[in-house]
Curated annotation (Swiss-Prot):
Protein name as it appears in the record: Sporulation membrane protein YtrI
Species lineage: Bacteria, Bacillati, Bacillota, Bacilli, Bacillales
GO cellular component: plasma membrane
Predominant localisation class: membrane
Disulfide bonds listed in the record: none
Keyword RNA-binding recorded: no
Originating gene: ytrI
UniProt keyword annotations, A-Z: Cell membrane, Membrane, Transmembrane, Transmembrane helix
């Protein structure tokens, strides 16, 4: 069996030539559109990379600023209130109103630390302790001395005291 000779029939020759030309034209069209889309994608990726780089720079700048502000705020924190707690008032059978009166008296003695910054109060904490401990307090006509058991310095100054009879 023999393959028919297509070169003798001009209709078939035109058909195959048209197929070849169409294939070449469609291949060039495909390359053009694919290249165009790839250029757009590459430019979009480059823009996004630049945008991400800018955003990362902004984030690092904001983080640095935030860190600096936090450091400044830590330095500038102020004592806003004072709380005093008497730990062993029950041992000496001191009534609740007398405990409250004693705590208020100690608060009045150390109230000058309110609105001072925490750092300066921390530096003078020994003076603050001695101020409380060196004073003799009168409760129900009995003399008591206070001993500072705990001194917590933050925006609230917390003092925990124990008392004993004054000698």
């Amino acid at each position: 069996m023999r393959v028919p000779q297509h070169y003798k029939k001009p209709g078939w020759q035109r058909f195959f030539a048209g197929m070849m030309c169409g294939a070449v034209i469609s291949w060039f069209f495909f390359l053009f559109t694919y290249g165009t889309f790839q250029e757009e994608q590459v430019s979009l990726i480059e823009k996004q990379k630049e945008h991400v780089k800018d955003l990362n720079n902004q984030i690092s700048i904001y983080q640095e600023d935030l860190h600096k502000l936090n450091e400044d705020n830590k330095r500038k924190l102020l004592i806003q209130s004072v709380s005093v707690k008497l730990l062993n008032g029950d041992k000496y059978k001191i009534s609740q109103p007398d405990k409250t009166k004693f705590e208020e008296h100690v608060k009045d003695d150390i109230s000058e630390v309110i609105t001072k910054d925490i750092e300066s109060v921390y530096q003078t904490k020994d003076l603050l302790k001695r101020t409380i401990e060196n004073k003799v307090y009168m409760i129900n006509e009995k003399k008591y001395e206070a001993t500072v058991r705990e001194l917590i310095i933050y925006t609230r100054l917390t003092v925990e005291l124990e008392i004993s009879f004054a000698t």
